[in-house]
C-alpha cells in the first residue's frame, strides 16, 4: 500500500509524514541529472556553475523554503510575470546542507512521469514575457532515486514575479498526493498558527531556509491561545543556521506539544531575514497554512 508523504529534513534526520504515522528515516544523497530544452518564445538555459547565496537579497524576487525531489516526488514551479515588461531571471535550487541541488529541470508535459532526464544542474535561466507564465519541473533521473529536500530562489530583473511550488507524489504512475505553497519574501519574523492534536493526527510543521551568505540565529517563541509565552526554543540546528542551509521540523518534535492550540513565532537575528513555509498534516492530508510576517509587540 502506498504512502501519502512529505519529507521534512534536517541535517541529520528526515521526517516522513505518512497517512497513519510519523516515521524517521535517513535518506541517501544523490546527484541528479537535468534535461536540455529551449523555447523560441522564452528560452530556457542551464547554468552548470555552483550558485551560492548572496548577502544582497534585493535581486531575489521569490523564495520557496521547501523543495522535494525523488522517491516519487516532483516539485513543479509555476512562475508568472504580472508586470508590464519582460522578466529575465534564474531559478536556483539549494539542498538542505547549502550545496547546489543537482536535479532534472524541465517544462513538464501533461504526465509528469514522462519527463526524460538530462545533464545535472542546479539552476535554470528564464525569460517570461509580460503577462506570461512558465512551468518548470524539478525531478530525479529515475523512479528509484531517494528523496532529497532543499529550497529554491528566483533572482530576476524586470517585470513583476509571482509564483507557487507544488509538491506531488506519484506511485506506480498514479498521483497520490499534492500540496502547494506560494512564493514568499524573506522575513525577519514569522508567526504560524498551531492547532496540534495527536488524537486527530494533526501536526504543524515549518521549513526555514537561510538565503544569505552569513549565519543567522533563529529562536522559536511558543504562545498559547491567550497570547502568553509558554516556551522559548533555542535549537542547536537553528543557532546558527548556516549560509544557504535549510531545516524542516514539526513543532512537537522539539516541544512535545502533541495537543496544543496557539501559535509559534520564528524570530531571526535583528537585520537578518529567512524564508519560511508552514504546513499542516491532518489524517494523512497535507495543506499549506499562512505564515504571517509580523508578531505581537510583547514577543521577543
Please tell me what each predicted stretch does.
Residues 25-300:
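Gly/Pro-rich, tryptophan- and cysteine-flecked surface segments typical
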Amino acid at each position: 500500500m502506498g504512502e501519502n508523504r512529505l519529507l521534512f529534513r534536517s541535517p541529520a534526520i528526515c521526517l516522513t509524514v505518512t497517512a497513519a504515522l510519523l516515521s524517521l528515516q535517513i535518506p541517501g544523497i544523490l546527484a541528479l541529472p537535468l534535461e536540455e530544452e529551449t523555447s523560441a518564445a522564452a528560452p530556457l538555459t542551464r547554468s552548470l556553475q555552483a550558485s551560492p547565496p548572496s548577502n544582497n537579497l534585493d535581486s531575489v524576487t521569490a523564495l520557496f523554503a521547501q523543495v522535494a525531489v525523488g522517491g516519487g516526488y516532483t516539485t513543479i514551479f509555476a512562475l508568472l510575470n504580472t508586470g508590464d515588461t519582460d522578466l529575465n531571471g534564474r531559478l536556483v535550487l539549494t539542498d538542505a546542507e547549502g550545496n547546489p541541488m543537482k536535479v532534472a529541470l524541465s517544462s513538464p508535459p501533461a504526465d509528469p512521469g514522462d519527463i526524460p532526464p538530462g545533464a545535472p544542474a542546479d539552476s535554470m535561466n528564464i525569460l517570461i514575457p509580460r503577462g506570461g507564465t512558465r512551468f518548470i519541473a524539478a525531478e530525479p533521473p529515475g523512479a528509484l532515486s531517494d528523496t532529497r529536500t532543499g529550497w529554491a530562489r528566483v533572482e530576476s530583473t524586470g517585470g513583476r514575479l509571482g509564483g507557487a511550488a507544488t509538491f506531488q507524489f506519484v506511485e506506480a504512475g498514479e498521483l497520490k498526493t499534492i500540496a502547494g505553497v506560494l512564493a514568499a519574501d524573506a522575513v525577519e519574523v514569522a508567526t504560524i498558527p498551531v492547532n496540534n492534536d495527536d488524537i486527530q493526527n494533526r501536526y504543524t510543521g515549518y521549513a526555514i531556509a537561510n538565503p544569505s551568505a552569513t549565519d543567522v540565529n533563529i529562536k522559536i517563541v511558543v504562545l498559547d491561545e491567550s497570547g502568553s509565552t509558554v516556551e522559548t526554543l533555542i535549537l542547536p540546528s537553528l543557532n546558527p543556521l548556516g549560509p544557504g542551509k535549510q531545516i524542516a521540523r514539526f513543532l512537537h518534535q522539539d516541544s512535545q506539544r502533541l495537543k496544543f492550540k496557539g501559535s509559534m513565532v520564528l524570530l531571526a537575528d535583528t537585520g537578518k531575514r529567512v524564508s519560511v513555509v508552514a504546513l499542516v498534516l491532518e489524517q494523512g492530508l497535507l495543506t499549506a497554512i499562512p505564515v504571517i510576517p509580523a508578531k505581537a509587540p510583547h514577543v521577543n
